[in-house]
Amino acid sequence: MVPVIALVGRPNVGKSTMFNRLTRTRDAIVGDLSGLTRDRQYGEAKWQGRSYILIDTGGISGDEHGMDEKMAEQSLLAIEEADVVLFLVDARAGYTAADQMIGEHLRKRNKRSYVVANKIDNIDENLARAEFSPMGLGDAIPVAGAHGRGISQMLEIALREFPKDEDELEEGEEVEEVAEGQEAKRIPGPSEKDGIKIAIIGRPNVGKSTLVNRMLGEDRVIVYDEPGTTRDSIYIPFERNEEKYTLIDTAGVRKRGKIHEEVEKFSVVKTLQAIKDANVVIFVMDAREGVVDHDLNLLGFALEAGRALVIALNKWDGMTPGERDFVKIELERRLFFVDFADIHFISAMHGTGVGNLYQSVQNSFKSAVTRWPTSRLTQILEDAVSEHAPPMVGSRRIKLRYAHLGGANPPLIVIHGNQVEKVPKSYVRYLENTYRRVLKLVGTPIRIEFKGGENPYEGNKNTLTDRQVNKKRRMMSHHKKADKKRRDKR
């Protein structure tokens, strides 16, 4: 399961700055997700092969209204749900009464908590550690979030007990796994043994649990016509046509302002974790409501996580032809950014169209985890460049030399060349569409990463032979004598 890290602390200690710096490492900020209070944000980040979910909580002032009330309103849920709590304090302001109250609460919860002394610029680190030692949460980790100082040490401590992502490939592995001349091959991994993990996600009351029951053929998940019936993510293994699957039924993510019970607030993290844990995401929408903004938020997170995607419009039965045509137009207009995903019009209640989901799941999973040899990917690149060359940069043209596979689920294609940092986004989209069309990729995002040409001798110090050293000395002596003669003539 993807670990969850919560940032807590008083107002203005740098939590949001830290949140932006950490999530910007993958440009995967997911701000203002529904189901969050006004001052909380959820984001996804990755550090040294470890993905994690980050929560930016509201500031806790510890004023006269009491610590418990503030914690319940802003940060208690994040602390309870988190695997690790980073307790940010202001090294400049020093140890305050509010810090003491927050520290006492964390000790009572028996959570893995670390004190992070932020704004350490021009402050003695040893003094900062001593300042916050009375809280009893270990030595403070000195950082300067605004400038990135100490961030690596903080993440190393926070994530050291969590393994690297399962689909992380070691450098160079992509070239050796597939022999030249072999067209493609399926990447072995946990999914081959345990079955394809499918996360069923969507807003509350769109029919996710009904769909799970229909796919299983039995009532395994309690279903009521009440949003938020499913309180936690439920993992259900099963087999169909000798294929293994595991369905993950997630609690519905409620719209902000409609959450009243603590247990439903937890469902936001559970949904995000389920997306990261899945191989394929089936995104369920209510056809009668069409595409709403909250659907786009959830789709955005699934895309940032790089998961294969299948879209199911539920409650299609009972709609008039005119209503169906309107919904299809809305889908084309608002879901253009996921045009690679199969869309199914289903009725989970009556089973119409549900069986077709399995083929899309299989196709999406295969596209997400298939590996191609370097020669194949490079040939596609050469054909694409031949048909439509990269633009000129000044008087020089961008050169793209070769490509190889850098990862799977989603497929990551690494392209090497010169001036690659100047490749425009429009050309990146052209390459993505070309690879998707030629490789017949369906249902999965595709990512392209560029690497510039590197000097293989950079950093190598050339050791001179004795003969070269003597020659260099003679030449330097000759130049000195020549300079002296020129000065004497003047």
Curated annotation (Swiss-Prot):
Q: Which superkingdom?
A: Bacteria
Q: Which residues are GTP 2-binding?
A: 202-209, 249-253, 314-317
Binding locations of GTP 1: 9-16, 56-60, 118-121
Q: Which residues form the EngA-type G domain?
A: 3-166, 196-369
- Tell whether Translocase is among the UniProt keywords: no
> What single Pfam family name could you report for this chain, choosing any that match?
MMR_HSR1
Q: What spans are recorded as compositionally biased (Basic residues)?
A: 470-490
Map out region (Disordered) in residue numbers: 452-490
Task: Give each disulfide bond as a residue pair.
Answer: none
Q: Which GO terms describe its molecular function?
A: GTP binding; ribosome binding
Q: Which InterPro entries match?
A: G_ENGA, GTP-bd, GTPase_Der, KH_dom-like, KH_dom-like_a/b, P-loop_NTPase, Small_GTP-bd
Gene3D superfamilies per the UniProt record, alphabetical: 3.30.300.20, P-loop containing nucleotide triphosphate hydrolases
Q: Which UniProt keywords apply?
A: GTP-binding, Nucleotide-binding, Repeat, Ribosome biogenesis
> Residue ranges of the KH-like domain?
370-454
> GO biological process annotations for this chain's record?
ribosome biogenesis
Q: Any keyword Nucleotide-binding?
A: yes
Complex and partners: Associates with the 50S ribosomal subunit.
Provide the function of this protein: GTPase that plays an essential role in the late steps of ribosome biogenesis.
- What family is this? Belongs to the TRAFAC class TrmE-Era-EngA-EngB-Septin-like GTPase superfamily. EngA (Der) GTPase family.
List the protein's name.
GTPase Der
The root-end lineage is: Bacteria, Pseudomonadati, Pseudomonadota, Gammaproteobacteria, Pseudomonadales
Q: Which gene encodes it?
A: der
